[in-house]
């Protein structure tokens, strides 16, 4: 439904130019929810702005619903107002001099061909019912809470029944509790409408919870994409592992590798562990073993197959505790149930659930 091929964008700078996008390729099928996730400056918002028609790419092409809306080689650049999209900005961009009805109705009033007044009213009220704001149609925008303004912004983006919905960090201005609530509401809204969605965020929780596909961006490129569980559980590199939650890294050398399983001798002679691997590895190759804090099982008595560590720090977090453990020269993080009670300086034994 949305197809992007070879997208590039360079901004002029005093020292010659900054390449914000370095060949972006991806597709979103009809009804899909695709998230661009990354730190500030990675290129995610530039990609969305190119799709919206707010930026003109230097290279590559963009198609929405089979229609080419940007093609640098052919000189095609369809203006934003002629693209079949809905857009929600980070700031919501609710017009303060209008009431809720007028805010949502505006896209219909300026579109061509014009709609009859009765049709506009019906479409606006339908959109407001979708977001639970039908009783606020006559409320002034300045008298809305942050969550209500966000709902109005969603209604305005959907009122034209666009082929593609673009969301530019729409939850980032909300407090933590409201952000979590709105995350569920947004999922339900998109599920009910079936609209194809491109979502931009730096928040890994939003990306993992809502997306069909997550694409992690860094340095103007997509460094890994896939289903949320796959990208989180099987990161391709340190960049992805570090950005998506907490990650532990252990250096080692491959002892043996076959049938998707590698035996790795950890540096410092601490131990040998067995880990899954999608790469073709040769004995003697240096590797990073990457695993999550929740993949570490911790106990206070030695058991066959466990690895001895020293507890460096314990941080109580309510339902769980986080341990910082020293294994040789490496520091590891582990999520531990409060029933396991240790203090800094104690010995502990761990099992790494690398097969997960």
Segments predicted by a language model, with ranges:
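Conserved ABC transporter NBD signature motif
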Residues: 60-72
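ABC ATPase nucleotide-binding domains
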Residues: 84-86, 90, 94-242
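Helix-to-loop junction immediately C-terminal to a conserved catalytic motif
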Residues: 52
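Glycine/charge-rich catalytic "coupling/switch" loops of P-loop NTPases
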Residues: 233, 261-263, 267-315, 339-356
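The feature captures the beta-strand-to-loop junction immediately N-terminal to the Walker
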Residues: 37-39
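Conserved coupling/switch loops of ABC nucleotide-binding domains, chiefly the family-specific signature
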Residues: 58-61, 219, 251
């Amino acid at each position: 439904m949305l197809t992007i091929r070879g997208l590039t964008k360079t901004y002029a700078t005093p020292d010659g130019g900054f390449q914000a996008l370095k060949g972006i390729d991806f597709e979103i099928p009809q009804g899909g929810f695709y998230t661009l996730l990354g730190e500030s400056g990675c290129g995610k918002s530039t990609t969305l702005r190119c799709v919206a028609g707010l930026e003109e790419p230097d290279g590559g092409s963009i198609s929405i619903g089979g229609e080419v809306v940007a093609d640098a080689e052919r000189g095609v650049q369809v203006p934003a107002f002629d693209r079949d999209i809905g857009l929600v900005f980070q700031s919501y961009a609710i017009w303060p001099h209008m009431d809720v009805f007028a805010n949502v109705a505006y896209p219909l009033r300026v579109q061509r061909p014009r709609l009859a007044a009765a049709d506009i009213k019906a479409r606006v009220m339908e959109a407001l019912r979708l977001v639970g704001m039908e009783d606020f149609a006559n409320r002034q925008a300045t008298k809305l809470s942050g969550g209500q303004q966000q709902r109005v912004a969603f209604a305005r983006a959907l009122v034209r029944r666009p082929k593609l919905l673009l969301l530019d960090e729409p939850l980032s201005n909300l407090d933590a509790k409201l952000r979590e609530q709105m995350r569920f509401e947004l999922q339900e809204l998109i599920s009910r409408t079936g609209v194809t969605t491109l979502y931009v965020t730096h928040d890994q929780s939003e990306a993992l919870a809502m997306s069909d596909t997550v694409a992690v961006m860094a340095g103007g490129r997509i460094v890994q994409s896939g289903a949320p569980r796959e990208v989180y559980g099987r990161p391709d590199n340190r960049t992805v592992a570090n950005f998506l939650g907490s990650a532990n890294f252990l250096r080692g050398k491959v002892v043996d590798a076959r049938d998707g399983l590698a035996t790795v001798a950890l540096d410092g002679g601490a131990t040998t562990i067995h880990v899954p691997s999608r790469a073709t590895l040769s004995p003697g190759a240096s590797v990073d073993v990457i695993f999550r804090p929740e993949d570490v099982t911790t106990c206070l008595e030695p058991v066959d197959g466990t690895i001895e560590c020293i507890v460096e720090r314990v941080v109580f977090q309510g339902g769980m505790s986080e341990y910082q453990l020293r294994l040789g020269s490496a520091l590891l993080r582990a999520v531990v149930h409060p029933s396991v009670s240790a203090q800094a300086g104690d010995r502990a034994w761990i099992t790494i659930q690398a097969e997960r």
